Amino acid sequence: GLKKKTGDLFKYVINDNRVNNNEILHIGDNIEGDVRVPSGMGINTYHIPRAIDIAKFYTPEMKSWVDTVSLNKTPLLDAVVTTISNRYYDDESQLKLSPYCADKFKFGYQAFGPVIIGFTSWIKKIAIENNIKKLYFLSRDTKVAYDCFNILYPDINIESHYIYSSRRSVSIPLFKSKKDLLVEVYKTIYSTTISAWLENRFGITKDQYSVEVLQKYSLKDYDHPIGGKFSKDKLSQLVCELSDIILENAKQERINLIDYLSSHGMDTNENIAVVDIGYAASMQSAYQKILNKENIHGIYYATFNSALKNVSDSSLLHGYSVHLENPSSPKYGICSHRFFYETIFCDADNSFIKPIKTNNGFEIVKSKFDDSTRQTVVKEIHSGVLALAHDLAENYSSSVLNGYIDPSLGSFLFDSFLKTPNKNDAEMFKGVLFEDATGPNIRRYLFVPDEYKNDKKTIDNMIWKEAASLFINPTPSQDVKIKSEPPVKNINNTISTKQNKNDKVKAKPSECKQNRVAVIERVIFELFLKGKKKNKYLRDRSMFFKDSNNKFISHYYKIIGSKF
């Protein structure tokens, strides 16, 4: 057939319509077939850069990502890049303050979204390959993956459940003897009070033992401080004295937990899998012991070699981005920025403590840790992730959605941001605390709030060290606008869409396509209208269309032109 790149199609149109070459305006997005070839024939051209081409010139990271993807393309990854480009890079005139414009939704859609979409598609693949009938997404780290799974694969013949889960919820039900309790005593103790330690580590509250019992072991009251230097012998003696209470409580928690898990069908003989962020398969191992069920698989974003200490059968372990490797490996983003990954994976909810059986089901007991700032940030980020999932589900077939995304490409933008953060974007995480129930009792931020921006100790304790360096060694480049370049240079006889450098007006995403149509309309009408009609169009566009007797022009204005 006739092709643009050879010029045959243009020759046919010119001859068929009996027009001169310079009386034609050709509009297209391909620099070769839509611009260079027709321009060489004397045809007027109007180049509309593709969204993906605009994206490549937005930031160095976007260009590197798009170029790398083009060399390692899979249908699903291509769909993700195209969808992101069409949403955010359809207008080359947009103002570029920073890669994500400090927009948490955009960050979720563009940077974190590909991480979760890739993980979710791989979860499906692993479940099918291992004949897994039920997937159990564990709170809070895989709520966003659970939601994406149900958006992308609503008709799959695999049950998906979201269950409340935490290290605390299984550690106490696993206590069955004094020996188990003494092992817990000799673990690291960070600065706390005796009552808080007994509640967090052994599950018993103040109303279950007296102050007099504490005083036998040099503990004056419930709020007596303890830490790493407090006598382990005295704590061992105290725990032994309280062992009957602790073990009875553990037994009841175990019964409640088994009933809760069974209510979700985990007591089945079929192959099932828990889905979690990672790393050492401790939750998988705990459920195997509590339910006395070996055929529980673990599907993780990352697994470390320590997982084999908990689950010896490696065929039950599945890692997406990292599998059974050293947790200190610098080549994986989740290894170098583990706490940040955990904080952003984690749903906007409080940590699960235990289920309590009631007449109407189960009461879900959660921690009271003040996590409001993180939860507000995560809600917006996760809403961006889910919007990406919805857009993919609405626009692509199951054959595409069933594809694969290389984890390093899925996390490319996210990891780039963590390694070289722009300060304007980094401030999206201002005041977000990292929660560590078993770690030291200090406030550790992803990005310090304003009241601590000059507090060296608080900055030193930031878990995001690259962001901390912005306070210690600020560089001018962190606050300047990103310099943009036009996707293509103007060529002879070509009309460019590039705006004046001084034009600071930022079009809203919803207006981008309307703006583009308006520009195209003006170019066409200025080119082909003559004399009074052209002057009337330029003077009063609305009146020009309303007074026109041309059916095509009137129909165009009614359907399209009147919208802007």
Give a label for each model feature:
Residues 30-45:
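Acidic, divalent-metal-coordinating active-site segment for phosphoryl/phosphodiester hydrolysis
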Residues 492-564:
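Membrane-proximal basic amphipathic "stem/tether" segments
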Residues 156-200:
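Long, charge-dense
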Residues 1-2, 97-115, 237-252:
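Glycine-rich phosphate-binding "P-loop"
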Residues 132-139, 272-275:
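Short glycine-rich phosphate-binding loop at a beta-alpha junction
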